[in-house]
Amino acid sequence: MSVKEHLIHNVHKEEHGHAHNKITVVGVGAVGMACAISILMKDLADELALVDVVEDKLRGEMLDLQHGSLFLRTPKIVSGKDYSVTANSKLVIITAGARQQEGESRLNLVQRNVNIFKFIIPNVVKHSPDCKLLVVSNPVDIWTYVAWKISGFPKHRVIGSGCNLDSARFRYLMGERLGIHSLSCHGWIVGEHGDSSVPVWSGVNVAGVSLKALHPELGTDADKEHWKEVHKQVVDSAYEVIKLKGYTSWAIGLSVADLAETVMKNLRRVHPISTMVKGMYGIKDDVFLSVPCVLGYHGITDVVMMTLKSEEEEKLRKSADTLWGIQKELQF
């Protein structure tokens, strides 16, 4: 008899069924691994699968996490180049994509990434036909559209991480100004993730007290307190971090884990995330932009219709036109 047979008396023969709360992360770069560790620390999955094309790095990352299993509550961490390892995932997080090369046009980069997504998405769909797709790769609004087109999934199951992080950065910076924790500072950034995002100043509040009511110039050029700078800092923050450390990872990883928690626990929290906005705010094309969405186990179930000023709506439409200009040139 083996040590195991001497030690353990079997009472019930378990059938090896599949995991009930499986999450997959596609891409084990800095962002993918920040997502992975943030999800593991929140105990959101009973199985975590990692996928990448770089096999040595992939296996190394898996082993490194497995060796920390004692300190985690996720019993199974697996990896593989073959997408069969992702089978029966409830949530699949896409962080993979090509980086822009020197002198390369944005459209050329976008087209190269379309070709990568044409490999990733069908493989994900084949092995997890009922999953929710959470797209993180940038430019996230375009990739969410591409993932939706290629997957054939209904729009509520294809989600972009969108402005969830922009809004978190905004609330952090607002809290720094006021000396209050960011959880108690409320403000929404919507629209395109990144440079042309739209801060909704009318909704900025602490304990239900509107800052705009206290200070009508809030967010305008006439504002002597320069609150507009807070939004500029949000837009510039990723560039600053990239300049200093070469990439962003921790904040986006934490933001993605926040979204994953809402999905896996069916919390029905409202997040500023990228969804199909055709028919909203006068937008006529198939584009994905961030608006406040009710998120849960089935994906995005509802959109909260914000009361936007005419110039805010105009900014959203302008972003939509820019995105559509790129999207309509893509070859699927």
From Swiss-Prot:
Annotated pathway: Fermentation; pyruvate fermentation to lactate; (S)-lactate from pyruvate: step 1/1
Single biological process term from Gene Ontology: lactate metabolic process
Chain sites annotated for binding substrate: R106, N138, R169, T248
GO molecular function: L-lactate dehydrogenase activity
Entry-linked CDD domains: LDH_1
Coiled coil spans: none
Keywords on record: Cytoplasm, NAD, Oxidoreductase
Binding site for NAD(+): 29-57, 99, 138
Signal peptide (from-to): none
A single cellular component GO annotation: cytoplasm
UniProt EC number: 1.1.1.27
InterPro entries listed in its UniProt record: L-lactate/malate_DH, L-lactate_DH, L-lactate_DH_AS, Lactate/malate_DH_C, Lactate/malate_DH_N, Lactate_DH/Glyco_Ohase_4_C, NAD(P)-bd_dom_sf
Pfam families (UniProt xref): Ldh_1_C (PF02866), Ldh_1_N (PF00056)
Main location: cytoplasm
Active site: H193 (proton acceptor)
Catalyzed reactions: (S)-lactate + NAD(+) = pyruvate + NADH + H(+)
Compartments in which it is found: Cytoplasm
Subunit (UniProt): Homotetramer.
Protein purpose: Interconverts simultaneously and stereospecifically pyruvate and lactate with concomitant interconversion of NADH and NAD(+).
Entry similarity comment: Belongs to the LDH/MDH superfamily. LDH family.
Designated name of the protein: L-lactate dehydrogenase A chain
Gene from which the chain derives: LDHA
